């Protein structure tokens, strides 16, 4: 089971270079399992025992498995994750012609580590909006092959490179995508037009706009002398999306189960399809349109907010509290912060520990050092937006927000098992 889950994750990461592609990948799995797509623009007709999913902006998704009992009686079991990761996004007018090379101007999305982006074989993917035959359309594109690189400056020309050299995002991150002949001009939108034709057989009248991100073409892999680790891009947080989907599709029981995978977490979640927007609440209210039904059901519900945690790095162990250092392959981590950067409280943490113990899954705790700041997740945002009790958890990871992150190869199976137990749980605290 562990090897199969890990290979499934590797395949999912390869198919999901952007939030748009991740959402499409999730939707394909759901449809293959018998889930029916609901369109927010239409009237909905749902029924007990039904299987449904909803997307918004092509980059966020909510999957719904309705049980036989009403949510007014048993509530919802929700698992939340996010589809986005830090990356380099192409600017609207990106062409930069310098010294005979064509580069593309990029904007940093989220809190990316810059240095790992150098000397990588990069490709480009995302969503393109265009006009064809007088009609406005959008399609996902993925160049797949390596088309760009950000070469490092040789140390002979930068002797301070290993002494904490700061990287200027504006000047040093534009990737090189081609060499130009003297006097040659380049139009990036024409390249997109050609890609639409190759990938979709569409000839666009004009490419109007796009949301495109560079990504590393190196596939994720199981690594380590004893295959202890998984290395790959976008583990934060497609690892949790994949675990949530596997748990939902394979969970026993007949409860009301929800998987929420939203975009824009890395930039604050404040969008119409992010966790700080109305997406989840609007979907739940449409499932419970009568009077105070939503408010009553949500107070019987619980959210597991799943987002990667910082594992104790052997070279930097002093960055952790000595008593709260999560180990890779040590199981899911309960995240706790007294200042509500995480939404966990004693009741929700206790319930998650109980699930882990009953499932024979190891569990760990994470608290930041008292002299360091703490990141946050969709947990507090969703809790405050919807009013749902929440526990923040995640799998321990190294190199978070790098172009290539590292997680334990045993931990995915741990997380899928306990999330499956959560979905199947007949009683919530």
UniProtKB/Swiss-Prot annotation:
Record-listed Zn(2+) binding positions: 82, 156, 401
InterPro entries: M18_aminopeptidase_2, Peptidase_M18, Peptidase_M18_dom2
SUPFAM superfamilies from the UniProt entry: Aminopeptidase/glucanase lid domain, Zn-dependent exopeptidases
Biological-process GO terms, alphabetical: proteolysis
Keyword set, alphabetical order: Aminopeptidase, Hydrolase, Metal-binding, Metalloprotease, Protease, Zinc
Gene Ontology MF terms: aminopeptidase activity; metallopeptidase activity; zinc ion binding
Pfam entry (one): Peptidase_M18
EC numbers on record: 3.4.11.-
Cysteine disulfide partners in this protein: none
GO cellular component: cytoplasm
Gene3D superfamilies named among the record's database cross-references: Aminopeptidase i, Domain 2 (2.30.250.10), Zn peptidases (3.40.630.10)
Needed co-factor(s): Zn(2+)
Family named by the database record: Belongs to the peptidase M18 family.
Alphabetical list of HAMAP family matching this protein: Aminopeptidase_M18_2 (MF_00467)
PANTHER family, per the entry: ASPARTYL AMINOPEPTIDASE (PTHR28570:SF3)
Protein name as it appears in the record: Probable M18 family aminopeptidase 2
Organismal lineage: Bacteria, Pseudomonadati, Pseudomonadota, Gammaproteobacteria, Pseudomonadales
